[in-house]
């Protein structure tokens, strides 16, 4: 069985407000991702700020779980409630992820996990204190996105090990990498942008044709 986990518990520290509840084309931002997974996966978990659990009304199929102080804590809380053999984790701040991405990343094959990612287009520099150290090999660099999918037992083990040693990864795949598990890649789309700043939200509105929001 598959479990989809939609993360919508962020504080919005960089954008200045809880972006998951911002209106995008007539509905809350998080709802765009939630609606895509409802008819794909058997179990759906929506991770919310604890004080929003009773305020947010969703489909009866959706299990609401309180998030934690950080993203990693929120995923861990959801994993404890998930029952699927494979979990598909997605940041609600990426409303342009397609159903095709969710379906493809969930097919793990021989991997312990898979991520949606896009090959780097720009020349990338390693910079320390304002000084360019070297140019990275662009052909080896991919921009990781979500959704990401994992064997639940493996990801839960990695989360527990990370918690024990105080390690915080920037995404869930980084935990598997740290502990020697295999992670595959599904090529995503450059349109699958993450809304981090106000201008990102305005750009996505233009892409979706709902600038009037």
Swiss-Prot record:
GO biological process: isopentenyl diphosphate biosynthetic process, methylerythritol 4-phosphate pathway
SUPFAM superfamilies referenced in this protein's UniProt entry, alphabetically: Nucleotide-diphospho-sugar transferases (SSF53448)
Site feature: Positions MEP for the nucleophilic attack: 138, 194
Site (described: Transition state stabilizer): 14, 19
Family matches, as CDD domains: CDP-ME_synthetase
Enzyme Commission code(s) on record: 2.7.7.60
Transmembrane domains' residue ranges: none
InterPro entries: IspD, IspD/TarI, IspD/TarI_cytidylyltransf_bact, ISPD_synthase_CS, Nucleotide-diphossugar_trans
Recorded catalytic activity of this chain's protein: 2-C-methyl-D-erythritol 4-phosphate + CTP + H(+) = 4-CDP-2-C-methyl-D-erythritol + diphosphate
GO molecular function terms listed in the Swiss-Prot or TrEMBL record: 2-C-methyl-D-erythritol 4-phosphate cytidylyltransferase activity
Pathway assignment: Isoprenoid biosynthesis; isopentenyl diphosphate biosynthesis via DXP pathway; isopentenyl diphosphate from 1-deoxy-D-xylulose 5-phosphate: step 2/6
Keyword list, A-Z: Isoprene biosynthesis, Nucleotidyltransferase, Transferase
Stored PANTHER family: 2-C-METHYL-D-ERYTHRITOL 4-PHOSPHATE CYTIDYLYLTRANSFERASE, CHLOROPLASTIC
Summary of the function given for this chain in its UniProt record: Catalyzes the formation of 4-diphosphocytidyl-2-C-methyl-D-erythritol from CTP and 2-C-methyl-D-erythritol 4-phosphate (MEP).
Family under the similarity heading: Belongs to the IspD/TarI cytidylyltransferase family. IspD subfamily.
Protein's name in the database: 2-C-methyl-D-erythritol 4-phosphate cytidylyltransferase
Organism whose genome encodes this protein: Aquifex aeolicus (strain VF5)
């Amino acid at each position: 069985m598959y479990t989809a986990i939609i993360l919508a518990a962020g504080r919005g520290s960089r954008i200045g407000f809880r972006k998951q509840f911002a209106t995008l084309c007539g509905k809350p931002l998080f709802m765009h991702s939630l609606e895509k997974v409802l008819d794909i996966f058997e179990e759906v978990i929506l991770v919310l700020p604890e004080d929003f659990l009773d305020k947010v009304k969703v489909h009866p199929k959706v299990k609401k779980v309180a998030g934690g102080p950080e993203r990693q804590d929120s995923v861990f809380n959801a994993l404890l409630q998930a029952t699927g053999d494979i979990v598909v984790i997605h940041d609600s701040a990426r409303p342009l992820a397609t159903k095709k991405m969710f379906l493809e990343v969930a097919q793990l094959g021989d991997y312990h996990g898979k991520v949606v990612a896009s090959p780097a287009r720009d020349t990338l520099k390693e910079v320390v204190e304002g000084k360019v150290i070297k140019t990275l090999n662009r052909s080896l660099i991919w921009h990781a996105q979500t959704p990401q999918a994992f064997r639940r037992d493996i990801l839960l083990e990695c989360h527990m090990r990370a918690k024990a040693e105080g390690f915080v990864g920037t995404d869930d795949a980084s935990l598997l990498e740290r502990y020697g598990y295999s992670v595959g890649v599904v090529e995503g789309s450059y349109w699958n942008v993450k809304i981090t700043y106000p201008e990102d939200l305005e750009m996505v509105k233009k892409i979706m044709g709902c600038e009037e929001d």
